[in-house]
Amino acid sequence: MSIEFVGWLNTYYVGIDQSSYEASKLPGIRNVKGGIHLFTWSPTYPAGLISGVFAMVHEDMKYSIDFDSKSETASLQKLDVLYDENFYPFESTKDWDLLTKFITVQDLQRIFATEGEFFYLDTSTYVNADLVSQDPEFSKPSRDDKLLNFAEFNLRRSWSPSATGPERSKQAIDKSFLFQRLVQSVWNDNPISALAELSISFLSYSILSHYGALEHWKNMLSLLLQSYELAETEPEFYASFLELFKLQLSSLSESDLETSAIFEKGVLLSCLDSLSERKVDGSFGSLVNEAIENLLKTISELLNSHEEQAGLMQKGDLYSAADYEAEVHETGDYVIDVSTEEDPIH
């Protein structure tokens, strides 16, 4: 598959999947594998508004992304003919294939509430949780605004309405009942759609800096990490979830890892502790146990790296302070009072 970038201003960046390029240097790309891709554009990458389109593309098709400078919008088009001899060859990374392996067009159509194979969003696109926001300063979406329709659930009320006593207590701790209810009511009896939604929300945050998607990603993680019975009864599915989570964490940049506050307040770490305790108790099979060990190893490495990076930054601040002190001492052991000089600075 080939894709041409048409009409782009030199100040823009365009991207595919997890890569971004100056628009002026990228007339097009070729050899793109068929499947789910995310095309993005931004005038001030990586800061500022980032727009994009999730797309199911086909290897035997040709496409263009056309930029309209008046409206500052872009659209993805199918083409009959495209001369791509001067386009750059593109190769999807193995990580991208794994990060999107669970996503189908049907999952995207459900979340974006639209037909077709192209699904547009940007950093500011509303999510359905915004409809019930209690923040008086928050502008709620209008009827015409685009909306991401993520699964809605309340982790604090994860039990069946008919559950009482010990059963209710169990379902308050173990979110498996809530997960299965969502599988039936939202994900069309297909638990893999939960992993698709986890993937879409993660990519929307990590690539488009969408913070509504970030909150949903963390809620989905909390739901799945506390679904202990699910880990026992569906080991292959649960190991796939843990492997996906591990890959997502590994693909986050240092700044995204910090901005996401993924381990702040101890919520997810507490979930992981509970999961580890059940592993030690022998609750899970070898497949899930191995996936837990691999995930915990990755988290440990990321946290250690993050602490080292923070330490280096702190050292940098100390060095800057030391350099400043050295400069001061080179001029003498006192501070010059400019008001005593002949030509004071006003």
UniProtKB/Swiss-Prot annotation:
Keyword Membrane: no
Keyword Cytoplasm: yes
Protein location: Cytoplasm; Nucleus
GO cellular component, one term: spliceosomal complex
Modified residues (Phosphoserine): 160
Highest taxon of source: Eukaryota
InterPro entries: AAR2, AAR2_C, AAR2_C_sf, Aar2_N, AAR2_N_sf
GO biological process: mRNA cis splicing, via spliceosome; spliceosomal tri-snRNP complex assembly
Keyword annotations: Cytoplasm, mRNA processing, mRNA splicing, Nucleus, Phosphoprotein
Cited function: Component of the U5 snRNP complex that is required for spliceosome assembly and for pre-mRNA splicing. Involved in splicing pre-mRNA of the A1 cistron and other genes that are important for cell growth.
Family (UniProt): Belongs to the AAR2 family.
Name under which the protein is recorded: A1 cistron-splicing factor aar2
